[in-house]
């Protein structure tokens, strides 16, 4: 009866209120059969296959199911159009959420560059999960739970951070974090306000905090308007290279990773023929260090689309590179083959 109640309710909301996406809190408390049945029921509706469905692949504690929970461990049993919040991607990029001081790749954690490749491929080329398709992976670094991205970046570097103060390094690391997950396969997700360095003044869980702490501070949107523009440019750039949003389980196989000095990460991805991509291929580099780095470019002519500060260079006069380019500190640098 509980399963029937869930399915009937969700179908009603989708049909009567035209809700086009469902997020399941603590999805691991439900069983695989129920969650798959919800997906199957939605798919019977006109346009139902376009309705998003994803959730938290954990229980938040114990479970009476003991097996077949709709969690990360049973990802292979879930429909390939049921997504999960990927904490592997989150923690690889910015560091663990339960230890405020634990760094991730963007803060210089040693050895973390190995997992960045897994995150870029939505873990489709890894034995860690693995998903049926990249569309099962929700790539993100911050949500309503735990520290905001801005707070986490400051907590890693300072014993007593000034959360409302400007910080150039944190700003650059914020851009790098966004530059990684917004150029990765999967379904990108960001917390409201991440694009203007949202802070909750170091509160890890603010569900019991005041509205003043939880509100969106629109003055920060003005203060950090360049960061807002950076996110806007990355989202527009991503939309012009559809292969990054492919649901094909084999799409990440086309990624070619370069051999670079550690901890730099670089990769090339050709466009899918006929998908209307603006460039023949993407070439992307991540530099989590505090110094500039020179890197070789693949054969061809490469237009710089983003230098790690401006993500809208592709809208202006073409800056074309061949043979070599220099990466700025704490940057995600993106090139398009022309």
Residue ranges of model-derived segments:
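Conserved alpha/beta catalytic core and glycan-binding cleft of carbohydrate-active enzymes
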Residues: 39-40, 45, 49-196, 203-207, ...
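Active-site neighborhood of glycoside hydrolase catalytic domains
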Residues: 1-63
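Alpha-helical packing segments of well-folded alpha/beta enzyme cores
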Residues: 2, 6-13, 34, 140, ...
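A short acidic (Asp/Glu
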Residues: 32-36, 64-66, 202, 295-296
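Carbohydrate-interacting/catalytic domains
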Residues: 167-171, 182-196, 200-338
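The substrate-binding groove and active-site-proximal loops of carbohydrate-active enzymes
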Residues: 1-3, 20-30, 159-169, 215-221
């Amino acid at each position: 009866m509980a399963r029937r109640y869930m399915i009937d309710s969700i179908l009603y909301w989708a049909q009567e209120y035209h809700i086009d996406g469902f997020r399941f809190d603590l999805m691991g408390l439900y069983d695989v059969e129920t969650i798959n049945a919800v997906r199957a029921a939605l798919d019977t509706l006109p346009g139902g296959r376009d309705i998003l469905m994803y959730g938290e692949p954990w229980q938040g504690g114990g479970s009476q199911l003991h097996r077949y929970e709709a969690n990360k461990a049973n990802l292979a049993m879930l429909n390939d159009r049921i997504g999960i919040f990927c904490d592997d991607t989150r923690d690889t990029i910015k560091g663990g959420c339960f230890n405020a001081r634990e760094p991730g790749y963007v803060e210089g954690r040693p050895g973390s560059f190995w997992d960045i490749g897994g995150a870029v491929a939505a873990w489709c080329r890894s034995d860690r999960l693995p998903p049926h398709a990249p569309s099962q992976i929700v790539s993100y670094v911050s949500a309503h739970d735990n520290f905001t991205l801005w707070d986490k970046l400051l907590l890693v570097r300072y014993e007593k951070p000034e959360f409302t103060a400007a910080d150039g390094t944190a700003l650059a690391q914020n851009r790098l974090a966004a530059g990684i997950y917004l150029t990765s396969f999967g379904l990108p997700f960001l917390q409201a306000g991440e694009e203007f360095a949202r802070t909750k003044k170091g509160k890890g869980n603010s569900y019991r905090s005041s509205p003043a702490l939880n509100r969106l501070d629109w003055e920060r949107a003005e203060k950090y308007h360049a960061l807002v523009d950076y996110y806007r440019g990355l989202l527009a750039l991503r939309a012009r290279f559809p292969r990054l949003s492919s649901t094909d389980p084999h799409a990440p196989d086309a990624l070619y990773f370069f051999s670079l000095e550690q901890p730099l990460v670089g990769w090339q991805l050709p466009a899918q023929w006929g998908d209307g991509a603006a460039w023949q291929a993407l070439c992307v580099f991540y530099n989590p260090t505090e110094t500039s780095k020179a890197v070789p470019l693949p054969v061809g002519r490469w237009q710089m689309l983003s230098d790690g500060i401006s993500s809208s260079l592709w809208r202006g006069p073409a800056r074309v590179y061949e043979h070599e380019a220099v990466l700025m500190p704490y940057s995600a640098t993106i090139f398009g083959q022309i």
